[in-house]
């Protein structure tokens, strides 16, 4: 099945999308990657969805990527004697380490590490920023606050401390258990929540032991500040605008999103724009105009993927949400302004032979009538470099490794094909021509670009580029390679 757009769609699975028929319908409607949220559902439920996805993959004969999203060290308050209290503006309130139900004056905060680093005048946000308190003073077991924005606070509501770098790992004990479980299942991408620094990524990578690719979620101010080192340590990025929009001024999010998308593209690492993209479609079959513009903006900026969360996991119209996102993407990518924007933000980075070859492939495609760029890739690096160029013609990523094919499903434009092992460039060209015909990227009278590395099956050796006819009778006519 050939997609009619290049940006990828990530769909979160949940109660509304737990059956074979629904998940297959999501794929057929446009979902390229399925997200399993480790914050919700048991290991048995996660495994069931994973099994269904792999069965669909087998049935349709197309690689599908699976992204497991770890919960991360989410901060929460304790419980209250009566389930909730109302905080009044300018009133005093206390967070402490006393493990007993709270009242109108105090509540348990079961995160001792915060008491060591939070300072007077820092903010504490409750329930996704609906309630805001300012710290007046701190002792080793109490944080005294004044209420700046009041409201009702109930049991175990989420807590954010935007001005504080918490001296804790990004992986809770639950996360470590979930990480091992997900890696043993065979997931393709592992998303780390509440990353603050590069060493958080390195810790997860050490535990993953090469079994999956690491994707860092940018949702804290400290992660934005340390983004370059986090990006270098990661295989991909998710701009998780929910918590990021709570901890930072909402007006700061759009320029941050634009900068982060551009930075990821420059280093050829995939970036997902996520959170509330079509949020109204949880309850409505139609999105708001503002939501359509939000999705469009991410696509115009050059994001590799856009993501659905509650819309596909728990909404009433999961399939419609995917179809809507697919239709938006097709419309935007057919807009002449889209191509102008994509071309104007292209990276000029050309440091290696592989960089030069992928740039040349894109330039040849722009000046000739070739119909596709076919890249043989073992590790996925060549395909990611071609994807970075955002060529005007389709990208066919050919690899003998199902693991590589699945992982590349997140990259802009990559149509992933499993091919047999090849040991001669002529065989590679023939394989590329057959794939181009099979998936309707080219007819027999057209030409394609083929890139590869010799010796074959050795990562990082991209060193050949050739324009080839699709007609096998004409391939290397008279060439005895």
Predicted feature locations:
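Non-catalytic helical/linker scaffolds that mediate oligomerization, partner binding
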Residues: 1-481
